[in-house]
Amino acid sequence: MKSKIYKIISLYSFFPFQEKLIIDLKNKLLEIENENDLSGLLIFAREGINGTICAEKNVIDIVINLINKYADYRNLNIKVNFSKKKVFKKLKIKIKKEIVTMGVPEINPSENNGTYIDSTDWNKLIKNQNTIVIDTRNHYEVSIGTFQNSINPNTRNFSEFPKWVDDHLDNHLEDKESTNIAMFCTGGIRCEKATSLLKKKGYKNIYHLQGGILQYLDEISKEENLFEGECYVFDKRVALDQELEKGSYSICHACGMPVSIQDQKRKEYRKGIQCHFCIDQFSDDDRKRFEERQKQIDRLKVENHKIYKD
């Protein structure tokens, strides 16, 4: 029997999205989920759409066509990947104030943002001595892979980025008027919104990597690749390597940090219970709960394996 191949689509678009249409699209997508093997996470807001979906190709095509209609065929940024396994359990659709939370309501990325730089021109830009490169992702994402010589704002979440800009960005600029500011993220959405923030604050020469790290790795040859390490992703794969295959990292289910194969060999590591990042963060009662949860997970895996063999 031929095994299924799942198509994984990461997508986003900034556009004015009316509340009535948000509800309508959500209901139609849930109908598709009921009839098909569709999973993922989608976030809808008045500023647009963001998310990742996973299904077989024919189902993905139906969903993308539907979303394009509601987005009025505006520029829907899409990254494609494939997997032999589902990377989400089910479809979740969330309606929020923002499709990526920054907490600065006065900016409007659909009307005012920086200049897209494609993968081919990105290397030239970041090698320019008059360019600073900023990784707009969270610190735990940066810790497993980033571009050479990029600045890590050490944020725990994207809503901390505006404060970092206010407190630290000018320290990295020799000349606010002439220095190029190049920003990147996983798929393009956070760095695009970050450019809108910087333009609102009066910064010039603002650029962002079109399609983010994922598109860059897909388009740039191994010899020209300036990205070092693996790229964190928000699904069961945890991280992708340079070939966009599942990487070497797992997740610590206690604290959510990515842990490498080497990390899992450390004496502090206990699967599902703790790692060296969080050993001092939780109480003994917390660890007992985590241990019981891990036992339940392991039992379910054994039961599912038996069902599959039978």
From Swiss-Prot:
Tell me if Signal is a UniProt keyword of this record.
Answer: no
Q: Which organism is it from?
A: Prochlorococcus marinus (strain MIT 9215)
Source organism phylogeny = Bacteria, Bacillati, Cyanobacteriota, Cyanophyceae, Synechococcales
What keywords is this UniProt entry annotated with?
Oxidoreductase, tRNA processing
What PANTHER family does UniProt report for this protein, alphabetically? Answer: RHODANESE-LIKE DOMAIN-CONTAINING PROTEIN 7-RELATED, THIOSULFATE SULFURTRANSFERASE/RHODANESE-LIKE DOMAIN-CONTAINING PROTEIN 2
> What residues make up the catalytic site?
C185 (cysteine persulfide intermediate)
Which catalytic reaction applies to this protein? Answer: uridine(34) in tRNA + AH2 + O2 = 5-hydroxyuridine(34) in tRNA + A + H2O
Question: Which GO molecular function annotations are given, in alphabetical order?
Answer: oxidoreductase activity, acting on paired donors, with incorporation or reduction of molecular oxygen
Family label: Belongs to the TrhO family.
Against PROSITE patterns, the record matches this protein to: RHODANESE_3
Indicate the enzyme's highest-level EC class.
oxidoreductase
For whether the record's keyword set contains Hydrolase, the answer is: no
Q: Which intervals hold domain Rhodanese?
A: 127-225
Please name the Pfam families in this protein's record.
Answer: Rhodanese, UPF0176_N
User: What is any one GO biological process for this UniProt entry?
Assistant: tRNA modification
NCBIfam families linked: PRK00142.1-4
Q: Known EC number(s)?
A: 1.14.-.-
Described function: Catalyzes oxygen-dependent 5-hydroxyuridine (ho5U) modification at position 34 in tRNAs.
Gene3D superfamilies, alphabetized: 3.30.70.100, Rhodanese-like domain
Mind telling me what this protein is named?
Answer: tRNA uridine(34) hydroxylase
Alphabetized InterPro entries for the sequence: Rhodanese-like_dom, Rhodanese-like_dom_sf, TrhO, TRHO_N
Tell me the superkingdom of the source: Bacteria
